[in-house]
Amino acid sequence: MKITKSLLFTLLLAGTAFVSTGCSKNNNTVTIYTSTEDYNIALMKKCLGEQFPNYKIVIEEKSTSEIAAQVIEEGSSSACDIVFAEEYGYLEKMIGQGVLDSIKGDYDLSRYLDDTVPASVNEYVLPNIRCGGGIIINKKVLEDRGLTKPTSYNDLLDSSYRGLVSMASPKSSGTGYMFLYSLVKAWGETEALSYFDSLTPNVLAYTTSGSGPVNALVNREVAVGFGMISQAVDKINSGNNELEVLFFEEGAPCNLYGNAIVKGKKAKTAVKEVMDYLDSFYTNESNRLYYPEPVLKNTNYNVANFPENIQYADMTGNNLAAKEALLAKWTH
């Protein structure tokens, strides 16, 4: 999802203040690592501040890959208590390294859709967000460059798009990876990797963050971004009428993101209470407001300007082993 901002947001009884990074040794301090978007962080700060006025909640932003690498390296000595909205592939990796606490039996996972609680993660992870991707365009930039709306991935290989495409790096971003994986499923590995070799001259930058492409579109730096539907819709609903979400015949790639407790941290009452709140209230609330692609059963959210009847790409087999094997062949 998004890049490290070197910012720590702390919720205090008296209000919100900036603090420096440090281990959350105080039993009333809960440190959360996340790659989620600014608007979700703002909502989380508000909700947690109201629910837990006597706790100090520290939220540190990092990319999905940075979160996994740091928690794996530090283990139970990590400053992090809760990993929030982490991509499932990286959560699988953390599980394999033994750096997450088991939540088996603590929560009613039957509330969640079956595909969000696969056997590979269901003893450690609470589902949080289903995030689909689309080809996001800036209509003004296209018009200024005399370009029409692309209708296929191959359209983006034309030299007229030189430097006008943005995509997150699959090696650092779950968003970037889901686009790569979806095309591997649609075309086969050789053709998909060859496509990105051909596309790279037209890519302004492979961003560290999954939010990077939409931000570049908003800043009119590019005309086309391989981005998150939810982020584009948030910009549209905030008054940006230049953006539009397109889908190609291969379908919309999709990723799942979840929450987990770092090894040894569940014993802290504050950490467990915050995790309980994320499960009982916050996931539904953030999905209702920003992420209507469902993770909970019996939900039907209506977010303004969010595309309906999305046809998703084939993402079957998207597991840690497949991810590591594919990323070993990514050279950009």
Annotate the PLM regions.
Residues 131, 161-168, 195-200, 206-207, 240-263, 277-300:
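Periplasmic-binding protein-like
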Residues 136-141, 255-270, 286-289:
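A bilobed periplasmic-binding-protein/Venus flytrap-type ligand-binding module shared by bacterial periplasmic
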Residues 189-191, 293-332:
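An extracytoplasmic/periplasmic, membrane-proximal ligand-sensing/linker region
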Residues 89-93, 218, 223-242:
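A ligand-binding cleft/hinge motif common to bilobed small-molecule-binding domains
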Residues 35-42, 79-80, 85-221:
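Extracytoplasmic ligand-binding site segments that recognize negatively charged/polar headgroups
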Residues 23-93:
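Early extracytoplasmic/lumenal segment of secretory-pathway proteins
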Residues 1-30:
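Short, low-complexity disordered leader/linker segments with a strong preference
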